[in-house]
Amino acid sequence: MEKLLEVENLSVSYFTYAGEVQSVRGISFDVKKGKTTALVGESGCGKSVTAKSLMGLIEKPGKVKPESKIIYQGKELTGYTEKEWNTFRGKECSMVFQDALVSLNPTMKVGKQIAENLKNHESSLSKEEIYQKSLEMLKQTGVPDPEGCMNKYPHELSGGMRQRVMIACAMVTHPQLLIADEPTTALDVTIQAQIIALMEELQEKLGMSIIIITHDLGVV
């Protein structure tokens, strides 16, 4: 089966006043097209740092070491400029974070936040087309009353609904790869199962690949 992403010898270090701290050392894995890969480990083992590396989100004093290779559809990403990363993020690869309340902008309505990704990557769309695409994506995530939800702020929604909104924000541009960083940790067991089922359904419908990051083998 064709590989969408190949990670070879990924190493990430943080250079602090106390010297070099190795966060990730020599990890290698690949992600097949249309399939799910799970990164499983205890808290603090470097799972989220690995995910951020794949999105070009390692900030100083952190650094992806020169021997690392991140190959996406045959292209080496580690040498990307910030402009190239901005094009890659959202269009080719999106991320769902652990805590939607922290990740979503509390001052912006849900509809505007979903539409923002479309505006950044599909500038040829009209205002009405952006609204309709955002609404359709929200409908696909199973949010009740999607039209009403578009006009709400994140704090007005339950934890499960916020996570669905996060998935809609990530998926509205139909990326090839979705990175889900502990997407169900902050949710109760019933809602956890619903979110996992939703991700599986969208994967089947859109043909995307998923990297799921978790410490819970039950989720895997």
PLM features: what roles do these ranges have?
Residues 193-207:
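Helical segment within the ABC ATPase nucleotide-binding domain
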Residues 172-176:
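A short, proline-enriched helix->beta-strand linker immediately N-terminal to the Walker B motif
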Residues 152-157, 161:
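Conserved ABC ATPase signature
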Residues 2-4, 13-26, 57-63, 80-84, ...:
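A short, flexible loop at the N-terminus of ABC-type nucleotide-binding domains that lies
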